[in-house]
């Protein structure tokens, strides 16, 4: 039984990673990609298939079962950290942002949004969390200056 559970978790992890890799590989700024990740279509009331496993005592207490879950979230945090580092290094975000903290914000928002939506049976709770995180990310971006100053006298 445990072997089947491990295989099922590995399949879920692989599917989640594949979907996320595909999204992260799209064209666009780091902000656009991160907000696309936040806003992508999800079955909000069902929740995250990996995140749900962290509420299962059997999974938490069985190293072979929790490992694929842990590995998936570690990978996701790293992938988002790299995305935010790239954005910062390209001048898209303010220079002093902590890319790892932004990655954690995004992951925690999605996971917490699932919990809020499921607890209230209201997808608007998820949407509000996602839009709040997107607004915070927007505040971390460097505004594009389109004004050209005229120095002639």
Predicted feature descriptions by range:
Residues 11-18, 63-89, 100-104, 131:
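Amphipathic alpha-helical packing segments from all-alpha helical-bundle domains
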Residues 32, 44-64:
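Amphipathic alpha-helical segments used for helix-helix packing
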Residues 1-5:
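Short amphipathic alpha-helical segment with a characteristic S/N-K-E followed by hydrophobic residues
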Residues 7, 14, 18-47, 99-106:
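Hydrophobic alpha-helical connector segments
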Residues 28-43, 74-90, 109, 120-153:
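C-terminal peripheral helix-coil segments that are non-catalytic and often amphipathic
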Residues 97-116, 132-136:
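Hydrophobic alpha-helical segments that form the core
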């Amino acid at each position: 039984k445990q072997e089947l559970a491990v295989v099922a978790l590995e399949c879920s992890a692989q599917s989640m990673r594949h979907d996320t890799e595909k999204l992260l590989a799209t064209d666009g700024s780091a902000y656009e990609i991160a907000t696309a990740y936040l806003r992508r279509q999800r079955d909000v009331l069902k929740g995250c298939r990996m995140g749900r496993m962290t509420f299962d005592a059997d999974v938490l207490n069985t190293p072979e079962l929790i490992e694929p879950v842990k590995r998936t979230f570690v990978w996701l945090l790293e992938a988002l950290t790299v995305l935010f580092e790239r954005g910062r290094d390209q001048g898209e975000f303010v220079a002093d942002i902590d890319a790892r903290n932004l990655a954690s914000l995004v992951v925690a928002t999605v996971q917490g949004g699932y919990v809020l939506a499921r607890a209230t049976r209201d997808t608007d709770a998820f949407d509000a969390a996602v839009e709040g995180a997107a607004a915070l990310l927007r505040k971390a971006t460097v505004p594009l200056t389109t004004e050209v100053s005229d120095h002639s006298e």
